[in-house]
């Protein structure tokens, strides 16, 4: 029996990964991390989606210690989300160590469950300047987890080389475009669905959707060539 753990935030990318996993694995477990993020709606959205999609289990882990250590627009209400990069070249929504922590804990959970895969929706094509969304980082994390736990564990990144239009096409391939469009939360301002329309996450999401809707056949062909 094939088993997977999906790192699940309730956003567009992780929901698309979860839907794909439900079609590819016999048993799928979702794990959501409460790190004191800007909007608690993210946790509620993930819980509702996990229930509606009938995952085998959904675990919400309290990792609010990350909030104490990582200063970011996503962990501090007093820091407004900016469309400009900081002096270090990173967006101010970058939470240092977040994916290191999430993948480590998801890997431990996978070990407990006997799951062979941890699935995450990180993407280098549209990685928004986050260093912990790069393929090189994922490969390094997989190596560290396998060595540290002395067992094979695959970090699966279905979206790594997809642009946002192709990610929308992937949701549509599983007949879930409307669900992802209307019920996920990607917005940095905590608005489900189309979001605020002005934050970086909403702008990237909307552009990808428009690009897909403008050329469905072409984008789907690009997706099929990559998958």
Curated annotation (Swiss-Prot):
Query: Which residues, by range, are in coiled-coil regions?
Result: none
Picking any one GO molecular function of the record gives: ATP binding
Cofactor(s) recorded in Swiss-Prot or TrEMBL? Zn(2+)
Q: Does the entry feature the keyword Ligase, yes or no? A: yes
Quote the InterPro entries the UniProt record gives. Answer: QueC, Rossmann-like_a/b/a_fold
Q: Where does Zn(2+) bind?
A: 187, 196, 199, 202
| PANTHER family assigned | 7-CYANO-7-DEAZAGUANINE SYNTHASE
Designated name of the protein: 7-cyano-7-deazaguanine synthase
* The species this protein was found in: Shewanella loihica (strain ATCC BAA-1088 / PV-4)
Q: Which gene encodes it?
A: queC
